Curated annotation (Swiss-Prot):
Family to which this protein belongs: Belongs to the DapB family.
Protein name per its UniProtKB record: 4-hydroxy-tetrahydrodipicolinate reductase
InterPro entries attached to this UniProt entry: DapB_C, DapB_N, DapB_N_CS, DHDPR_bac, NAD(P)-bd_dom_sf
GO biological process, one term: lysine biosynthetic process via diaminopimelate
Ligand binding (NAD(+)): G11, C12, Q13, G14, R15, M16, E37, G101, T102, T103, A125, S126, N127, F128
Organism: Tolumonas auensis (strain DSM 9187 / NBRC 110442 / TA 4)
Gene Ontology CC entries for this record: cytosol
Pathway entry: Amino-acid biosynthesis; L-lysine biosynthesis via DAP pathway; (S)-tetrahydrodipicolinate from L-aspartate: step 4/4
Binding site for NADP(+): R38
Amino acid sequence: MTAPIRIALMGCQGRMGKALLEAIRANEQVTLGTALERPGSTVIGLDVGDLNGLGAMNVLIADDLEKVKDQFDVIIDFTRPEVTLKNLAFAVANNKRIVIGTTGFDDAGKAAINEAAKKIGIVFASNFSVGVNLVFKLLEQAAKVMGDYTDIEIIEGHHRHKVDAPSGTALSMGEVVAKTLGRDLKQCAVYGREGITGERDRNTIGFATIRAGDLVGEHTVMFADIGERVEITHKASSRLTFANGAVRAANWLKDQPCGLFDMQDVLNLK
């Protein structure tokens, strides 16, 4: 029997970190090798299981990957771009695979991820939900059939604490639609409208953002014509849906060579 893959969980006390901890604990194919928080945190040195009401897991929270590099095989990182890029550099230097769920990277950050994928295996996705990745495929079909003659709008909502907008998932949805239609999202995206905007340009893709309460994640892509519209919607009610997908990706990644992958690869949807 193959030994479980050992996970290094970054940001273990964040919202996604806690969901990932639960998902790792429930999955027999993986095990928690180490859990990390930022240097100076008051939780450093505590048992991550005891701290989260799960009982002792014999994993003490660390603050430096270098100190625990022999305790894991794959990193799961849902933190912030600047933190993830630092962890990515560590992964390359130490030949560790990494699953990246962090969003909000600029072009330089994305380029660094692409460069790292020449040396290690990386799963990088804006959304690890199976349902959202099915939506990506549905959007391709809708764009092929309706995209050239409808107005396309993407509306997304998340909790009040989310720091980037639009969400990485919304941008990925826009990329799927734009690519299918042969457009460049950077040129055709419209992020919010205010004042006298003039008539809508049919070739644009609009984005609207909601930040409120404890919304986990809601996305709707609208293809609107005169007299009818099609809306493709995904609503997440628990972060566990993303956490389970990320753990699934980590287990899948163990058998892959170096390269850049996403959840479409993990789910064999390509």
